[in-house]
């Protein structure tokens, strides 16, 4: 029990350290996100204030008539930025048109008045004027298209970068939430383990008190030693079976995940094989829980052995003097090849011909039954359970 208590304390220490580490990291990430948001808003506000110094049409002051202008708080409301940007874009278009008109006049005068040979233009419909005007418009449109294309490209890059950044930020927050949930589940499991350990300690104390009331000290020592040996055996068996059961569940989960991933590629034959394998693992899990985990030292099965290279399973039935050996015909798609029932009689081991014939006729080359169903049925029938 001291070893179990020490293990629980170690688990509690590790969980506490992990929990503290996640809390510190999560708080640091949230603080960085909040600081980044404040800096972004500050940059937006600073940019608009800088524009306000050069342009009177930008007013970043709070619209509150009850306060003097000097007492108003300077701020920028992000919700109205889109509308304001549209207004500014319209104004910039007007400024652009005005600038282009002036530039057109500049080109016009440059090509007409600066020449040593002035052009004789009768009107705006004059061919030379029309040609020069078209050239100016072409240059204007070319420059405008290039600049607008660059602006749109930069805007798209900014939007994509912002979207990717937001997705990664949300993913980080979700990972911290999932980690917190996993830690809570670990605490629940640890508390459950602690309760089970306490119950086991109480049961052991009750058995100890009962033994101490015995008058025979030799029997007490012998019984204590026997119980201790049984406890060590059960602990090792429980650890081994728990590990094997965990591995089986992992294999089952891997098969399920693999089946989901390859569902689109081969939904016919593959799903049938995966389903059969999952069914086999489920039957193995139930068989293990029924005859080992739930019964513990009271199990009716002894010397359970699996010969993977031979495709063979062998075990004994306690108190019945039976030895059962089951051979498989194919490891990839196992079917029962042969069932051998041996019985210990005196000092000899003989074949139970009647049981052999019965079970072989029933299960040999039968594709509809799994080996674990066969094993469970044989045990139940021989032990009359």
Swiss-Prot record:
Coiled-coil intervals: 128-175, 229-258
Pfam families referenced in this protein's UniProt entry, alphabetically: Kre28 (PF17097)
Location in or out of the cell: Nucleus; Chromosome, Centromere, Kinetochore
Keyword field: Centromere, Chromosome, Coiled coil, Kinetochore, Nucleus
Residue spans crossing the bilayer: none
BP GO annotations: homologous chromosome orientation in meiotic metaphase I; regulation of meiosis I spindle assembly checkpoint
Keyword Coiled coil part of the UniProt annotation: yes
Cellular component GO terms held in the UniProt record: kinetochore; Knl1/Spc105 complex; nucleus
UniProt keyword rRNA-binding, yes or no: no
Purpose: Acts as a component of the outer kinetochore KNL1 complex that facilitates microtubule-kinetochore interactions and the spindle assembly checkpoint. Kinetochores, consisting of a centromere-associated inner segment and a microtubule-contacting outer segment, play a crucial role in chromosome segregation by mediating the physical connection between centromeric DNA and spindle microtubules.
Oligomeric form and interacting partners: Component of the KNL1/SPC105 complex composed of SPC105 and KRE28. Part of the ten-subunit outer kinetochore KMN network that includes the KNL1, MIS12 and NDC80 complexes. Interacts with the MIS12 complex subunits MTW1 (via C-terminus) and NSL1 (via C-terminus). Interacts with the NDC80 complex subunits SPC24 and SPC25. Interacts with CNN1 (via N-terminus).
Annotated family: Belongs to the KRE28 family.
Name by which UniProt lists this protein: Outer kinetochore KNL1 complex subunit KRE28
Species of provenance: Saccharomyces cerevisiae (strain YJM789) (Baker's yeast)
């Amino acid at each position: 029990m001291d070893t179990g208590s020490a293990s629980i304390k170690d688990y509690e220490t590790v969980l506490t350290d992990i929990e503290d580490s996640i809390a510190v990291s999560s708080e640091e990430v949230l603080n960085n996100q909040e600081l980044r948001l404040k800096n972004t808003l500050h940059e937006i506000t600073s940019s608009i204030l800088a524009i306000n110094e050069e342009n009177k049409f930008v007013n970043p002051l709070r619209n509150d008539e009850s306060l003097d202008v000097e007492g108003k708080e300077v701020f920028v409301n992000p919700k109205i930025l889109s509308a304001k940007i549209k207004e500014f874009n319209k104004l910039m278009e007007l400024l652009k048109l005005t600038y282009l008109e002036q530039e057109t006049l500049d080109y016009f005068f440059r090509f007409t008045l600066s020449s040593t040979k002035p052009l004789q233009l009768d009107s705006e419909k004059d061919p030379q004027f029309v040609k020069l005007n078209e050239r100016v418009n072409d240059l204007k449109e070319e420059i405008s298209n290039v600049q607008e294309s660059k602006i749109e490209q930069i805007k798209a890059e900014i939007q994509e970068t912002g979207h990717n950044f937001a997705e990664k930020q949300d993913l980080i927050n979700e990972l911290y939430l999932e980690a917190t949930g996993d830690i809570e589940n670990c605490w629940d499991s640890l508390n459950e383990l602690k309760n089970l350990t306490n119950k086991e300690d109480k049961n052991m104390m009750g058995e100890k008190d009962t033994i101490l009331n015995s008058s025979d000290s030799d029997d007490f020592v012998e019984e204590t030693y026997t119980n201790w040996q049984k406890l060590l055996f059960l602990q090792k068996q429980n650890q081994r079976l728990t590990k094997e059961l965990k591995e089986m569940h992992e294999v089952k989960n891997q098969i399920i995940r693999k089946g989901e991933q390859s569902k689109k590629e081969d939904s016919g034959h593959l799903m049938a094989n995966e389903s059969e394998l999952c069914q086999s693992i489920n039957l193995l899990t139930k068989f293990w829980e029924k005859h080992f985990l739930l019964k513990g030292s009271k199990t009716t099965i002894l010397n359970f052995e699996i010969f993977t290279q031979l495709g063979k399973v062998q075990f004994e039935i306690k108190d019945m003097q039976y030895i059962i050996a089951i051979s498989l015909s194919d490891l990839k798609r196992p079917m029962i090849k042969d069932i051998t029932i041996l019985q210990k009689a005196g000092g000899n081991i003989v074949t139970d011909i009647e049981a052999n014939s019965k079970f072989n006729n029933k299960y040999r080359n039968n594709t509809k039954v799994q080996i674990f169903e066969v094993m469970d049925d044989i045990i139940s029938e021989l032990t009359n359970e």
